């Protein structure tokens, strides 16, 4: 099986010569061209569709409003800045979210950059909070996060955005009319990471995950084009919770090193686990029971998310199905390793990730061919 665990190279984005600030990925920009070992679902023409362009939703064409398209156009950021911002978000996704990034490769070209943008927003905020290599105090990180958030909401109100990440996020939010309240909730939860190191109960943890995970699902919905957005909200939120709880279980050791425990303290007490037990190289029987309990809880969230897949546009379903398998497979791997969470990060094998991708590729290509893209020209394009 071709190794697809690390997504094939996408080396940049370039403006389209015909439709304003379109996105294109070199190596994928000629008709019929694909990257090694990875066919592009339904790809037939040059370049990626520009931000603000959508394909038809279930049953009929659907595009962002003209007002949204105008707001998201060149007035928000120049073409060079915009394409560079989308490329930066793609790089963040590829570098830090390999399973998620692999699943996004099953989306149609025109949807993918917007998903990268939303991932980039979340990842960049996370890097501010975790202070990766900057040596800032918690107070300085709080100020940096507040400043970044204020600039983001300011850009949404108008003006030219030159931020290397936010230009793409602002463009995506305007193009699809994504609820700004979701971003406020997310930033509130990110700020909690600067002061809160543990959660007493699962309800307390859910209060944090509401902003850090559930709203990520609802942010994505407009891009994924559900037939019934209202019905799709609950499953989308459940999927966000499932993904994050999976990460919390897998990353127990990494979080401990940062002084955080995301597993509810009430659960530790229930199974007779002390925080220090989570740092033992060899998990105790009590730790194994605790982690098995948390895995079962995560699986319940995955089950609650499943009905939402069929509500999405057909071209979005293969991506989400693959993501469900990729993240759910981490729980399988944790169980197979007898909950050895401190001996390196638990990952699916390259062969298994490749097999999951290949299993959904045909459906992705078929759906992309059926959904004819509708071009929304931006003013001045």
Spell out what each predicted region is:
Residues 21-61:
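Long, intrinsically disordered low-complexity tandem-repeat segments
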Residues 2-15, 68-243, 249, 253-381:
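Catalytic cores of Mg2+-dependent Asp-rich isoprenoid enzymes
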Residues 37, 64, 248:
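Alpha-helical and His/Cys-centered functional microenvironments
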């Amino acid at each position: 099986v071709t190794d697809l665990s690390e997504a094939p190279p996408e080396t940049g984005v370039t403006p389209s010569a015909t439709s304003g600030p379109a996105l294109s990925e070199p190596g994928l920009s000629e008709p019929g061209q694909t990257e090694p070992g990875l066919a592009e679902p339904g790809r037939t023409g040059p370049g990626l569709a520009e931000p603000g362009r959508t394909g038809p939703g279930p049953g009929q064409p659907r595009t962002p409003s003209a007002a949204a398209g105008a707001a998201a156009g060149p007035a928000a950021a120049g073409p060079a800045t915009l394409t560079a911002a989308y490329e930066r978000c793609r790089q963040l996704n590829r570098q830090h979210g390999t399973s998620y990034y692999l699943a996004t490769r099953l989306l149609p070209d025109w949807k993918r950059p917007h998903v990268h943008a939303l991932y980039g927003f979340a990842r960049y905020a996370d890097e501010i909070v975790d202070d990766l290599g900057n040596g800032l105090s918690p107070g300085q990180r709080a100020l940096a996060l507040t400043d970044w958030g204020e600039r983001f909401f300011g850009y949404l109100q108008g003006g030219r955005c030159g931020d290397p990440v936010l230009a793409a996020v602002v463009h995506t939010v305007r193009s699809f009319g994504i609820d700004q309240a979701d971003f406020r909730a997310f930033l509130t939860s990110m700020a909690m990471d600067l002061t809160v190191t543990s959660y007493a109960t699962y309800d307390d943890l859910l209060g944090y995950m509401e902003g850090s995970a559930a709203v990520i699902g609802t942010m994505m919905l407009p891009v994924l084009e559900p037939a019934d957005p209202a019905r799709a909200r609950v499953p989308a939120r459940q999927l966000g919770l499932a993904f994050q709880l999976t990460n919390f279980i897998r990353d127990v050791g990494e979080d401990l090193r940062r002084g955080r425990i995301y597993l509810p303290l009430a659960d530790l007490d229930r199974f007779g686990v002390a925080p220090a037990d989570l740092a033992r190289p060899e998990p105790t029987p009590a730790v194994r029971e605790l982690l098995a309990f948390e895995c079962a809880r995560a699986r319940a969230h995955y089950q609650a998310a499943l009905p939402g897949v069929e509500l999405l546009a057909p071209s979005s379903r293969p991506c989400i199905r693959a993501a469900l398998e990729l993240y759910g497979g981490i729980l399988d791997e944790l169980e197979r390793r007898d909950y050895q969470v401190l001996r390196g990060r638990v990952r699916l094998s390259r062969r298994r990730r490749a097999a999951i991708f290949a299993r959904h590729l045909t459906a992705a290509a078929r759906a992309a061919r059926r959904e004819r893209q509708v071009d929304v020209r931006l003013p001045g394009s």
